[in-house]
Structure formats: C-alpha cells, structure tokens
C-alpha cells in the first residue's frame, strides 16, 4: 500500500488539518479503549454492584449528618455506610432506668468534653478519654447506654461491624481498618462503637492468623500511636460481657470503664415502672413485690416478664371471643354483639406473677440464675 503513495507525499510535513485529524482519532481511540477495559473490569468484579450501592448510601448518610465537601476514598465510603444519624436514634436517657450513677458519669466524662470543648482546651488532664468500655452481664443496658450517648452527644457515630473489616484479599482488611480512623478524623467529633468488642479485639496469641494479627495491631496503632494527635476528637467505645477475653493492650486504651451489672431490688422496681409506663394497669399492681422476687434478673429479663404478663390478657380476650362464637352457634336468632378488639382488660398483679413464674422456669432450665453463672469477672 505504501508503494502506491507518492514518495513526495510521504516526505512532506503534515498539514494542520491532518495533525488535528490524527489527534482526534488518537483521542477517540484512547477513550474507547479506556472505557472498554473499564467496562470489562467492572463486569468481572463481583462486588461492583455492592460498591455502587455502598457509595450511594454513604453519600446519603453524609448528607443527613451535615457533612458536605469532604472527599472520601473507596475504603472510607465502605466505612461511611456504618454511620448513624443521631437524630434517627429513638433512645434517650429517659429510656434507661436504674443506672443513674453511670449516666451521670457518662455525661461528665464523655458527653461534656465534646459539647463544651472550650472548657477543656487549657488542660491535658481534662481531655476526653481515647476509649470507654462498658462491661457486665448480658441484657443489662450496655448497648442502650451507647445509643443514648450517641443521641445526647450529637457526635458523628460509627457503629463498626467486625465483618466490614474482613476481606478475602490480602491487605484489604488493613486498608479498611485505616479507613475507619481516617474517616473518623475527617468528620470529627466522632465516636466509634464496637459492640461485643471481645469477638474482634480478643486476646492475641501465636495461634492468630497473620491477617487478623496485623489488623489488630494496626487498629491499636491508629487508635493511640505515634501519629495520633492529642487534640483528636475521636473516641472508641466498646461493650462486652466478657472483659477477660479483651486484649490487655485494648484495655489499656480504654482507661474509662463502666461496670453495668445486674440491677438490685430498687433498680428492678424502677426498670419495671419504666417498662410498664403507658400500659393499662390495674390499680392493685405492686411492683415492689415483683422486684423483690426477681433476684438475678437483668433488664432484658424484666422486659420479657412484662411481655408475658401483657399476653395473658390477650389470651383471655381471645378465649372469651371463642366462647361467644360457640354460644352464637346455638343462638342463631340473637344479634351478634360487637366487641372492640382494642378494649382489653388491665394487666393485673396475677399476670405479673404468672409471667414471673414462667421466667423463673425458663431461667432454671438454662441455669442462668445460678450464682456461679452470675459472678462478675474483675476488670484489672
């Protein structure tokens, strides 16, 4: 083909139009190649749809909490999907009963330094702690306190899940771990909450997988290491019912620890009063009697007890309706009486005692009321 082109045409310089045309063709070819390769790579990536959804959700959450104009990496976008808007949390301090002392300490230690930072800027001793640990038996209100803290503080809140930091590709877990703290710094003041922290940051041993050990080490380094600023407004809050399984280096980074133990009789009465508030109760209700007979019960147990008691009136109503239907089959000439299903009898003391007996049988079957099973593990 080149032999058909005159020699003079090959040797002469290109005209302006020919240069522009060549550049246009090269640009179009390069763009087509780039987008073709990108389309193939995206099509082969099984997580592409998940990443796209995560990006949309992260942008929506960032807008809800009032963070705009902040550039996030791909890994920070994944962590941003775990953000919680404090305004969407329905739990307040009024929903926590029997823990007045802990609530007061939480307000002074955690919430006040974030809300009144100008009062604490002149002293290193008045800086908020880097970490806070809530520990105690299950069902005693640790997670409830964390929710109320997030609501009251008004800080950005990351509800971190351990599964979010695990990835099958080598090195990805470390990048996600780094993104947790880089995102928290960008949107500070921020609280990073780890529920059941013992399952993620448990005691290290030689049996740990290399990737897991590296992830724990990086988490601690970013949390409180050489690069950590003294004026950082990032706090890690954890909750566990097995503090003895949490690594010692993690406990060192959580100098402020609150023991949320089983409620005493007075606290149980207060919890029962809160749970039953707004319910249709009989005037003969004696919550002090129920509280005195529920030794070793957690707040979660008391809520289940009240739920069972409320169900007894529903069962009575259903049985009465069934008996009326049977009677109407033999009295077809009489007009059927209309009964409003919302009109249930009040919860009585007998209902609560029945619920207490049922809960006691359940706990005896699982041996959860045995004092040996309820002993507290000291937090060193």
From Swiss-Prot:
SMART domains in the cross-refs: AAA
Chief location category: mitochondrion
Family: Belongs to the AAA ATPase family. MSP1 subfamily.
Pfam families cross-referenced by the UniProt entry: AAA, AAA_lid_3
Protein name per the record: Outer mitochondrial transmembrane helix translocase
Enzyme Commission identifier(s): 7.4.2.-
Localization annotation: Mitochondrion outer membrane; Peroxisome membrane; Postsynaptic cell membrane
Mitochondrial intermembrane side: 1-18
Gene Ontology BP, a term: anatomical structure morphogenesis
Entry keyword Cell membrane: yes
GO cellular component assignments: mitochondrial outer membrane; peroxisomal membrane; postsynaptic membrane
Gene: atad1a
GO molecular function annotation: ATP binding; ATP hydrolysis activity; membrane protein dislocase activity
Gene3D superfamilies in UniProt: 1.10.8.60, P-loop containing nucleotide triphosphate hydrolases
Organism from which the protein derives: Danio rerio
Functional description taken from the UniProt entry: Outer mitochondrial translocase required to remove mislocalized tail-anchored transmembrane proteins on mitochondria. Specifically recognizes and binds tail-anchored transmembrane proteins: acts as a dislocase that mediates the ATP-dependent extraction of mistargeted tail-anchored transmembrane proteins from the mitochondrion outer membrane. Also plays a critical role in regulating the surface expression of AMPA receptors (AMPAR), thereby regulating synaptic plasticity and learning and memory.
